[in-house]
Each structure stands twice: as structure tokens, then as C-alpha cells.
């Protein structure tokens, strides 16, 4: 005969035999330790009621006596709930009944106690899921700890026999209760039709079990305290009904009343089939009965959830890229870039970057590269400025100290950042009038200004004039008509129309990208092109004479006011 013991068990048994314990002692010890078919309680130790014989499974007599709970019963090993557990009222109630039905229930409970606790727990859990029974109902009736009950049903955590007897008693009685509920005919239901019938059935059945007790049971039930009222079970959608409703939601998100009533019949039929009863007994669903109002609320909740998810998605999208924190982002989102073809490295391309840093410094760097006979001017103005919140109207974006920019063999880079950031908060009308008249003139044009101030063809055009820290003041200066060549007029018309729609700071890049400062392949029309190439300058009217008297030393002092 092959031994069923594992190697570890054989080793332990050999150690016991080698320790001097005889075979008879081991058998006697095993008889004392192993629970008997009477569930660990010896028959001679039981206090039997006089009306019951020893063949009536006396487990309830043992469990209902408080002084016998100290015995080690099956299923007690490893129980984490160490609190003393008084005899549940449901056990006392069942023990006090002398009817044939009560005897059958006790026999069923004893049979379940003799089986594997984990198998019984899985059976009870499946039954609760099939009928949508919440654990709260079991806790209210049996007095068990909900955490311990959940662990026992889901993980097979050991539970004391007395507690398992209370759980099994509830399970046996619930089975009979549901059978009676489906077979019971509601009195007076023939006078109620339509939705009102379903609503009354909904509120009638939770109390139906207490108003119509099982025959043979006493009216004053001791299963619950006299002053404690049983709560009505909350409605819970079953998996069968949810499957039907989600399919209907894909077809129609807002069904009509007729469609909802058809869904009610379909859901109740599915719930009955799930419970293993005929669809004609849908009234026995009790608190789980599906009504038209519940279907309407289910669709309304799904529509609200979908609208809420869409709103969250839109908010997440709108708060992402639409709030730039630097000028580069503002320019990239404000207008498309039209870059000029160039063979210079990317680091030398024209651009502007506005960084929010702690220092109020403005640096400008210019790199000029020559390719053949054409001199390309590449400038990069890096603005390191504090956040606009920290600025006031007395601050300017350029440092107050003057700087000299030495240029050899080329023109000056365009000065396109002379503006006050606080002028962006002015009225739209005022900005519209200013931005339509803003221009920047090349140095050769300034030379022409000094020579043609008294010509008859001159017209008054405002030029940016920076005076005493205010960089937004405009002053009219007589410009010569020859400044406005056809090429310049077309550019100024485009720039004026664009600046009328957007703030000036966002227009700077548009003016740069419109080839206004690019090298012109057409012959220049100014008189001093050999001295000053077509570089742009923003100057004060008091400095025009100084610029006109400059020599050809290729070093042009440009003071940042």
C-alpha cells in the first residue's frame, strides 16, 4: 500500500516515533484531536433538550449554549476574528421552532457544516451574485463582521463554526424565501396596471417577507432587536440587464417611452432567466424589478457621464497649448513663419526669444555672414526680461545704459523690439490707430530725410520716438516721397492691415517674416547706399542730423535709449 503522506509528514512521524511515543499513544492523541462527525463536539458533552434524540444533529443545541463556544470547532483554525461572538438571533429563532420546515432547515445547515467550508462559501457567493443580494443584508441579519464575511466568501478565510452556522442558516432561509416570493401572488394586483403596478410591487416586496412570514414561524421574530427596522435593499443593476442597456445605448442614446418599456420587459426577462425562474414570474424580483423610471434614469446618467467626459477632454485640450508663457510660443501660434532660404547655421537665423528670468537684462547679438557678393544680415535678439507682472510703466525693455554695436562689412541689424509691453493693455481703438501708422525707415532713408525736408512732395509719417523711458510715443517727421517705392508700399500695406488686427509685439515677427529687412536684389533707390546698406533703424528726431553727419568709418554708434 502506497503511503499518502508527504516526505515532510513522514519525517515528522518518524521523529515522533523516535522520541519514544508509541503507536497507541499516537492513535489516542489523534482520536482526541480530530473532529468527529458531530463537528468537534462530543455527544456526551452536549446538553440535549429532552424532546430531541441523539440522531437529530444536535449542533444547534451546542451552538446556542454560550458556555460551549470555547471548544475547538472545525473551521476555527486561523480565524482572525478573535472577538467573542454571541449566539446570533437567527440561530436562536431557528432552534426555537418545532415545525417540520424548521427541522428541514436545521438538517440542511448541519449538512453544509459537514462539508468543506470553502466549497460552501463559493456556493453562497454565487447565489448572492445570481440574485443581486448585497453583503449588507447578510451582515444585518447574521450580525457578522462585513470584512470577515467578505474575506470568507472571496478568499476562504477560516470562520468559526458558530458564525458559519449563522451564515448557512441565512442562506437556507433565503433560498426558501425567494422561492416563496416568486410563487406568491400579490393580493389585489389585478386592480393595478402599467407603471403604477411596478412601482407598488417595488415598494411592497421588501416588506413582503416580514408581513408574510413562513408558515409556522411566530409573529414576534427574535432575529432582530425589536427597535431595529430592516432597511430596504437598494436597487442594483444585474449584469444581464446592463448588457442589454449598453447595447441599446449604442443604438439610441435617448430612447422613447415605448422603447424604454420594451427594454423593461427585456431586462426583467433576462433577470428571471439569470435566476432560473420563468419570465412570467417577474413580479418575484422584488427590489430588483426593473421599471421604466429606472431605465430612464440609467440612460440620463449615461448621457451625463458622456457629456462630462467630453467636457474634461475639451478643458484639458484648451488649457494645454493655448496659454504660452514665452514670446516664442506667442509668435509661433500667432502667425505662420516665412523663413528666407539661407545657408547659415540654424543658430544664426533671425529670431527672437523672450525668457522669464529674474534679471532685467537685454542683450543683442548680431552675426553677419558673407556669401559671394551678397551680404546676408543675421541677427538674434535675446530678451531676458522679468515677467510682465513685475514691470510698470516707468520701465523700458532696454537697459538704461547705452551700448555701442560695432559692425564691420555690413549693415546694422533691425531694431524691432523698441516698444513698451504695457501698451498692449491699452484700448483696441488706440492700438488700432497707432499700429496703422507705425513704420521703420532704413538709414539711407534717414539720409534722404535730412536732404529733402523742404521738398514739396514730402508727406508726414510718424516714426517711433523714444523719449524719457516711454517707448510708445509717436512724432511726425517729414519723410520724402521717394521712401515709398512700389516694393515698400506693398509691404507697408500688408503690414498695416496685419497690425490692425494683432498687438504690436506679435506683429514684430510678421514684419520680419514678410522680407521687410531682407537683402533686396533690386537696385537700391537711395542716394547713400554705398555708405549705409539697407539696414533698418528707429531713431529720435534729434539724432537725424547726427546720423547725416556720420563718416564712412563703418562703425555706427547706435545708442539704446
Swiss-Prot record:
<dbReference type="InterPro" id="IPR039066">
    <property type="entry name" value="HNF-1"/>
</dbReference>
<dbReference type="InterPro" id="IPR010982">
    <property type="entry name" value="Lambda_DNA-bd_dom_sf"/>
</dbReference>
<dbReference type="Pfam" id="PF04812">
    <property type="entry name" value="HNF-1B_C"/>
</dbReference>
<dbReference type="InterPro" id="IPR009057">
    <property type="entry name" value="Homeodomain-like_sf"/>
</dbReference>
<dbReference type="GO" id="GO:0000978">
    <property type="term" value="F:RNA polymerase II cis-regulatory region sequence-specific DNA binding"/>
</dbReference>
<dbReference type="InterPro" id="IPR006899">
    <property type="entry name" value="HNF-1_N"/>
</dbReference>
<dbReference type="GO" id="GO:0031018">
    <property type="term" value="P:endocrine pancreas development"/>
</dbReference>
<keyword id="KW-0539">Nucleus</keyword>
<dbReference type="InterPro" id="IPR006897">
    <property type="entry name" value="HNF1b_C"/>
</dbReference>
<dbReference type="Pfam" id="PF04814">
    <property type="entry name" value="HNF-1_N"/>
</dbReference>
<feature type="domain" description="HNF-p1">
    <location>
        <begin position="1"/>
        <end position="32"/>
    </location>
</feature>
<keyword id="KW-0238">DNA-binding</keyword>
<feature type="region of interest" description="Dimerization">
    <location>
        <begin position="1"/>
        <end position="31"/>
    </location>
</feature>
<dbReference type="GO" id="GO:0048806">
    <property type="term" value="P:genitalia development"/>
</dbReference>
<dbReference type="InterPro" id="IPR044869">
    <property type="entry name" value="HNF-1_POU"/>
</dbReference>
<keyword id="KW-0371">Homeobox</keyword>
<comment type="similarity">
    <text>Belongs to the HNF1 homeobox family.</text>
</comment>
<dbReference type="GO" id="GO:0006357">
    <property type="term" value="P:regulation of transcription by RNA polymerase II"/>
</dbReference>
<comment type="subunit">
    <text>Binds DNA as a dimer. Can form homodimer or heterodimer with HNF1-alpha-A or -B.</text>
</comment>
<dbReference type="InterPro" id="IPR023219">
    <property type="entry name" value="HNF1_dimer_N_dom_sf"/>
</dbReference>
<dbReference type="InterPro" id="IPR044866">
    <property type="entry name" value="HNF_P1"/>
</dbReference>
<dbReference type="GO" id="GO:0001822">
    <property type="term" value="P:kidney development"/>
</dbReference>
<feature type="short sequence motif" description="Nuclear localization signal">
    <location>
        <begin position="228"/>
        <end position="236"/>
    </location>
</feature>
<dbReference type="GO" id="GO:0003700">
    <property type="term" value="F:DNA-binding transcription factor activity"/>
</dbReference>
<feature type="region of interest" description="Disordered">
    <location>
        <begin position="319"/>
        <end position="372"/>
    </location>
</feature>
<keyword id="KW-0804">Transcription</keyword>
<dbReference type="GO" id="GO:0005634">
    <property type="term" value="C:nucleus"/>
</dbReference>
<dbReference type="GO" id="GO:0001889">
    <property type="term" value="P:liver development"/>
</dbReference>
<feature type="compositionally biased region" description="Acidic residues">
    <location>
        <begin position="77"/>
        <end position="86"/>
    </location>
</feature>
<feature type="domain" description="POU-specific atypical">
    <location>
        <begin position="92"/>
        <end position="187"/>
    </location>
</feature>
<feature type="compositionally biased region" description="Polar residues">
    <location>
        <begin position="353"/>
        <end position="372"/>
    </location>
</feature>
<feature type="compositionally biased region" description="Basic and acidic residues">
    <location>
        <begin position="49"/>
        <end position="58"/>
    </location>
</feature>
<keyword id="KW-0805">Transcription regulation</keyword>
<feature type="region of interest" description="Disordered">
    <location>
        <begin position="49"/>
        <end position="87"/>
    </location>
</feature>
<comment type="function">
    <text>Transcription factor that binds to the inverted palindrome 5'-GTTAATNATTAAC-3'.</text>
</comment>
<feature type="compositionally biased region" description="Low complexity">
    <location>
        <begin position="332"/>
        <end position="347"/>
    </location>
</feature>
<dbReference type="GO" id="GO:0030073">
    <property type="term" value="P:insulin secretion"/>
</dbReference>
<keyword id="KW-0010">Activator</keyword>
<dbReference type="GO" id="GO:0042803">
    <property type="term" value="F:protein homodimerization activity"/>
</dbReference>
<protein>
    <recommendedName>
        <fullName>Hepatocyte nuclear factor 1-beta</fullName>
    </recommendedName>
</protein>
<feature type="DNA-binding region" description="Homeobox; HNF1-type">
    <location>
        <begin position="230"/>
        <end position="310"/>
    </location>
</feature>
<dbReference type="InterPro" id="IPR001356">
    <property type="entry name" value="HD"/>
</dbReference>
Amino acid at each position: 500500500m502506497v503511503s499518502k503522506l508527504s516526505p515532510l509528514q513522514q519525517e515528522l512521524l518518524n521523529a515522533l516515533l523516535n522520541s519514544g511515543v508509541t503507536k497507541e499513544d499516537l492513535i489516542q492523541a489523534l482520536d482526541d484531536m480530530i473532529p468527529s462527525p458531530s463537528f468537534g463536539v462530543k455527544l456526551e458533552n452536549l446538553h440535549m433538550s429532552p424532546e430531541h434524540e441523539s440522531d437529530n444533529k444536535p449542533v444547534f443545541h451546542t451552538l446556542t449554549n454560550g458556555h460551549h463556544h470555547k471548544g475547538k470547532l472545525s473551521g476555527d483554525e486561523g480565524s482572525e476574528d478573535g472577538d467573542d461572538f454571541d449566539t446570533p438571533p437567527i440561530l436562536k429563532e431557528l432552534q426555537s421552532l418545532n415545525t417540520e420546515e424548521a427541522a428541514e432547515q436545521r438538517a440542511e445547515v448541519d449538512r453544509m457544516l459537514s462539508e468543506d467550508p470553502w466549497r460552501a462559501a463559493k456556493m453562497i457567493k454565487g447565489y448572492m451574485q445570481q440574485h443581486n443580494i448585497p453583503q449588507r443584508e447578510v451582515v444585518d441579519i447574521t450580525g457578522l463582521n462585513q470584512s470577515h464575511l467578505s474575506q470568507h466568501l472571496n478568499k476562504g478565510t477560516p470562520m468559526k463554526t458558530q458564525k458559519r452556522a449563522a451564515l448557512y442558516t441565512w442562506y437556507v432561509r433565503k433560498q426558501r424565501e425567494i422561492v416563496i416570493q416568486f410563487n406568491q401572488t400579490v393580493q389585489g394586483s389585478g386592480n393595478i396596471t402599467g407603471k403604477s403596478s411596478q412601482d407598488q410591487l417595488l415598494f411592497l416586496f421588501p416588506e413582503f417577507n416580514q408581513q408574510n412570514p413562513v408558515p409556522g414561524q411566530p409573529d414576534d421574530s427574535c432575529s432582530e432587536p425589536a427597535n431595529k427596522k430592516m432597511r430596504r435593499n437598494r436597487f442594483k443593476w444585474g449584469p444581464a440587464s446592463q448588457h442589454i442597456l449598453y447595447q441599446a445605448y449604442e443604438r439610441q442614446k435617448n430612447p422613447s417611452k415605448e422603447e424604454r418599456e420594451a427594454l423593461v420587459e427585456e431586462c426583467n426577462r433576462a433577470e428571471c432567466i439569470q435566476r432560473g425562474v420563468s419570465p412570467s414570474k417577474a413580479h418575484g424580483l422584488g427590489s430588483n424589478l426593473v421599471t421604466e423610471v429606472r431605465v430612464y434614469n440609467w440612460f440620463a446618467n449615461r448621457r451625463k457621464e458622456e457629456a462630462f467626459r467630453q467636457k474634461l477632454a475639451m478643458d484639458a485640450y484648451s488649457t494645454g497649448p493655448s496659454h504660452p508663457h514665452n514670446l516664442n510660443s506667442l509668435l509661433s501660434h500667432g502667425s505662420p513663419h516665412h523663413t528666407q532660404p539661407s545657408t547659415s547655421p540654424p543658430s544664426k537665423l533671425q529670431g527672437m526669444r523672450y525668457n522669464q528670468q529674474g534679471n532685467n537684462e537685454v542683450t543683442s547679438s548680431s552675426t553677419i555672414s558673407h556669401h559671394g557678393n551678397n551680404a546676408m544680415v543675421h541677427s538674434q535678439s535675446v530678451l531676458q526680461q522679468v515677467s510682465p507682472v513685475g514691470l510698470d510703466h516707468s520701465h523700458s525693455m532696454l537697459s538704461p545704459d547705452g551700448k555701442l554695436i560695432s559692425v564691420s562689412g555690413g549693415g546694422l541689424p533691425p531694431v524691432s523690439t523698441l516698444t513698451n509691453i504695457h501698451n498692449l493693455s491699452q484700448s483696441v481703438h488706440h492700438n488700432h490707430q497707432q499700429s496703422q501708422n507705425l513704420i521703420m525707415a532704413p538709414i539711407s532713408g534717414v539720409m534722404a530725410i535730412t536732404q529733402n525736408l523742404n521738398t514739396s512732395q514730402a508727406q508726414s509719417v510718424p516714426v517711433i520716438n523714444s523719449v524719457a523711458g516711454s517707448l510708445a510715443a509717436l512724432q511726425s517727421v517729414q519723410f520724402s516721397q521717394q521712401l515709398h517705392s512700389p516694393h515698400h508700399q506693398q509691404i507697408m500695406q500688408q503690414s498695416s492691415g496685419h497690425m490692425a488686427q494683432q498687438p504690436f509685439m506679435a506683429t514684430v515677427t510678421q514684419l520680419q517674416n514678410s522680407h521687410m529687412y531682407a537683402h533686396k536684389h533690386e537696385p537700391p533707390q537711395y542716394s547713400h547706399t554705398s555708405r549705409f546698406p539697407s539696414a533698418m533703424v528707429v531713431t529720435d528726431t534729434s539724432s537725424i542730423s547726427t546720423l547725416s553727419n556720420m563718416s564712412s568709418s563703418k562703425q555706427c554708434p547706435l545708442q539704446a535709449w
